[in-house]
Regions:
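Short, flexible loop segments at the rims of nucleotide/cofactor-binding pockets, characterized by
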Residues: 23-24, 46-52, 104-107
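Glycine-centered flexibility sites
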Residues: 43, 75, 115-116, 194
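Intrinsic structural disorder
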Residues: 1-7, 43, 107, 126, ...
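Residue-level marker for the onset of beta-strands and adjacent loop->beta junctions
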Residues: 33-34, 57-59, 187, 192-194
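Conserved beta-strand hairpin/beta-sheet module of binuclear metal-dependent hydrolase folds
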Residues: 34-96, 126
Length: 194
């Protein structure tokens, strides 16, 4: 005698997404409110920075050090991000703001991570810490701001099989990187392995 079993329905992305989401366990019931921080470990504070895109926020970190606190990642160059930084470090604000910002560390050159780095380093008279590759790639991308997409790049993408509509999107977005970042400082402290 064989036992009869029901067929397992095929998994769809929606089913997979919902089941994965229902099994996630978050250590905090809610993110910090704009301009507020949440201490997630001794000396490590979580700050949520708004973004004007589909991904509507980035997590940035304030890490206490011997002389104040280091900022890890910065948010994109927007009025909302500037307002959050001003609310986070007001004159005579919360107890942790008595520390000065000692450095700004940027993990990589995407505008949501590096966008406010130049503003923060000037506002707090501190150094930017970044890898050499990311720093110089950021400077190169910013230098293209306002330029049209190069013909050789358009030819490359056509040869790679891009449709004309995809080329049009690339052309429309090219040269906008610098709009999302404050100018980087002329020097930086190099982060490297080891």
């Amino acid at each position: 005698m064989t036992e009869r079993t029901e067929a397992i329905p095929e998994s769809t992305p929606e089913v997979a997404s919902n089941s994965a989401r229902s099994t996630l366990c978050y250590p905090y019931p809610a993110p910090p409110a704009p301009g507020s921080t949440l201490e997630i470990a001794p000396g490590v504070r979580w700050l949520r920075m708004p973004l004007p895109w589909a991904l509507d926020h980035i997590n940035v970190w304030l890490v206490d050090d011997a002389e104040g606190c280091a900022v890890v990642d910065t948010g994109a160059r927007t009025e909302a991000a500037t307002a959050v930084w001003r609310a986070t470090f007001p004159q005579g604000g919360e107890a942790h703001t008595a520390f000065r910002v000692t450095r700004v560390l940027v993990t990589h050159m995407h505008p949501d991570h590096v966008g406010m780095a130049g503003w923060l380093t000037r506002a707090f008279d501190c150094r930017l810490w970044m890898t050499r590759t990311e720093y110089f790639n950021c400077r190169v991308a910013a230098a293209d701001t306002g330029r049209e997409a190069p013909a050789d790049a358009l030819d490359f993408y056509r040869r790679a099989g891009w449709s004309e509509s995809a080329i049009d999107v690339y052309r429309a977005r090219f040269g906008r990187f610098g709009q999302h970042i404050h100018a980087l400082p002329e020097s930086f402290r190099r982060l490297q392995d080891g």
